[in-house]
Amino acid sequence: MIKAESAAVNSELGIISASMGVAIRQAADEIVRGEMADQFPVDVFQTGSGTSTNMNMNEVIASRAAEILGEPVHPNDHVNASQSSNDTFPSAARVAAVVQLRTTLLPTLDSLRASLVDLSNRHEATVKMARTHLMDAVPMTFGQEVGGWARAVELSSERIKAMLPRLAELPVGGTAVGTGLNAPRGFGSMVAKRLSARTTSAFTEASNHFEAQSSQDAMVEAGATMKIVALSLNKIAGDLRLLGSGPNGGLGEIILPALQAGSSIMPGKVNPVIPEMVQQVAAQVVGNDATMTFAATMSTLQLNTAMPVTARSLMSSIHLLANAASLLDAKCIRGIEVDRERMRRNAERSPAIVTALAPRIGYDAATKLVHQAEEQGVSLAELIEQRDVGASPIGDALLAMTRPAD
């Protein structure tokens, strides 16, 4: 897209002929559609400016444009006119990232959040035992727990949207070192405007080309944001695994959709396939962030010289997270079954439910109730009802404990 819109601007400004501009745009658009993919053998691990890839692109476009035009098209003089690898490659990386974030990851996160909100609403009165340090705490509702997950996903989307304007500042027009040598005045802003119209994204020319080309802070920020999204999804996936553990020897409070046989030796075993997939994706995204962080240390004087691996790492994270969030939504969250009775029993058996009684009967008396329930082999709920120390039926009391401010 960068080459196509640069050709249009070069044609408009008289740098190349109108017919050549049309031919270059047609060739570039064919590549965007996936044609001639076999003409790009250059590996991502190359010179740090991305010059190898930029020249590969220039040469393929020039060759195809010459076929279309019926006259020679030069890869440097015509296709790369008003450009340098040093501004074109990082611009292409940013355009690709912004477009993929807007068209794949953000919509997927929105869908996941909607499914979590729906699950939360359906279980706003389903009482369960909260746990801190993996130990019983006080009652809450499953709806409250899932609502926390939904808010985390919502915040992930907000973080992405907040950093998009910085990622959408394009170095194009800065040419070799940011001075704009050999590029006509206004070239960068004109290309950014055309890219905005083409992608419906708000691209702008970098406010300072020296910053945009000598460092890649916006790309690193995007990678770090992907890490936060990954860690958020990892937390949800970890909770799903734990809540669905067992079912007989674990918590077993939810039943995750069964996607495949869980063992080649243990018949009937079902594993939390999707949550474990999400957690592995999170591990990879954290690794990609570490790669981008190290790559940022290769910003020296007027150029960052690790652009290819930076771009690859960010695009990998976006792709992985979009797929992981989509599968988590469609293959897990929407199919979760909740064992309400097991949640209720676990809550009633927990010593933590006397917490609400402590202000009325005193800490020591509440502690004594816990010990008596253990000695008699009954649940605290049963003992509380026997002693008539609760102000309401235990089910109502447990639900009331989840909303103490009401």
Residue ranges with predicted function:
Residues 1-406:
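Conserved, well-structured ligand/cofactor-binding cores
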